[in-house]
C-alpha cells in the first residue's frame, strides 16, 4: 500500500467513526491527489462524497474537500441545500459557510453558475432573517423627509492597505462622493468578510484580513480628502456590535449607503434603515446582496437578468453602469532590463488574482497558436 492509499484509508476510517478530523492527514491526501488527471480526481471526489454520514458539520467538510478536488458546482449546490435545511446550525455558522462558498465561487469561475448564485442569494436571505430574531432593537426605515441629504455612508467589509482592491475601491468611492457630489462621507469597515466567528470544519478555510490597530482610527485620508472612519470589532459578526452600528445609522440618517462588495450581513440589515446600493468588486457577475440596488456593467445585463429573476427580484434591482477602477499610485519602477526582457520583444501581460484557475489548457492552446519568437508572456499576480 503506497502513501496515498494509506492516507485515503485513514481518512475513511476517521469519517466512519465520526472522529475529529486530522487536518494534517487531509492536507497530505489533497496534495497527493490535486495534480492527478481529471478523471482520477473525479473518481476520488465521488468516492469521498459517498462517505457522508448525515452529520451536518462532517458532511459540509466532505463537500468542501470534494469541490477542491473536482471543481464541480454540484458540490456547492448540495452544500447550500444542506445548510438551508439544517436546524442545528445557527446563523453565524451559516454565515461562515456562506462566506466560504462565496470565496470558492470567486476563486473558481467555473463554479459561478446560475443555480449556485441563486443558492447564495437564498442562503443570505435566511441568514438575515435568523439574525434579526436575535436583535433587541427595532429597525426603523428613515423617511426621505428626515434624512440628511449632505451625508452618505460608505460600507466595506474589509479595509486594509491601498494594495488591496476593495480597500482602494472604497476610498475611490468616498473621494468621488465628497469631491464631485459635495457630500460628507462616513466610511464604515464592517469587518465581517470571511470571518472565523461561527467556524465549522471546512477544507482550506479562507480568512479575511484585518488590521486591529485601525480600530483606533476616527479618520482616513485619500487624495487630499478626509473621511470619518469607524471599524467594527474583530469578532464580527457580533450582535452587540451590529446593533451599535445600526443605532448609529438610525441616528445619523444618511441620504443613502454605498456598499462596496455588498455581501456583508451588516450591509443587509442597514438596507432596512436607509436605501443601499451595492457596487461589486468584479465586472463579470452579479452580487448576492440584500441591498435594494446594485450596479451591474451594461455588458452583463443579459447575463444577470435570469439570475436576478430566479432569485425572486425584478430588474429594478439592477442599475446599469460602467465598471470602473483606477490604478494605485506607482511606487516601484521595473525596466525590461531588470527582469531580462529584450527591448524589441512584444510583451503580453496577464494580470489577475486567480491565474491558476483562469489560465486553462484551452487558453494555453490559443496562446500557443499566436506566439512567435519575438513575443513574451509575463504573468503578474497569483498563479
Q: Where is each model-derived feature located?
A:
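N-terminal subdomain of nucleotide-sugar transferases
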Residues: 1-54, 59, 66, 82-83, ...
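Active-site-proximal region of nucleotide-activated glycan assembly enzymes
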Residues: 107-119, 273-330, 343-344
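Short acidic, S/G/P-rich loop/turn micro-motifs used as interaction or catalytic elements
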Residues: 158-163, 193-195, 234-237, 263-266, ...
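Conserved catalytic-core segment of nucleotide-activated headgroup transferases in glycan assembly
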Residues: 163-176, 312-383
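Generic beta-sheet signal
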Residues: 188, 260, 279-282, 297, ...
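Conserved nucleotide-sugar phosphate-binding/catalytic loop shared by glycosyltransferases and other
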Residues: 201-238
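Short N-terminal targeting/anchoring amphipathic segment
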Residues: 247-263
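Short, Asp-centered acidic motifs that coordinate Mg2+ and/or phosphate
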Residues: 255-256, 293, 377
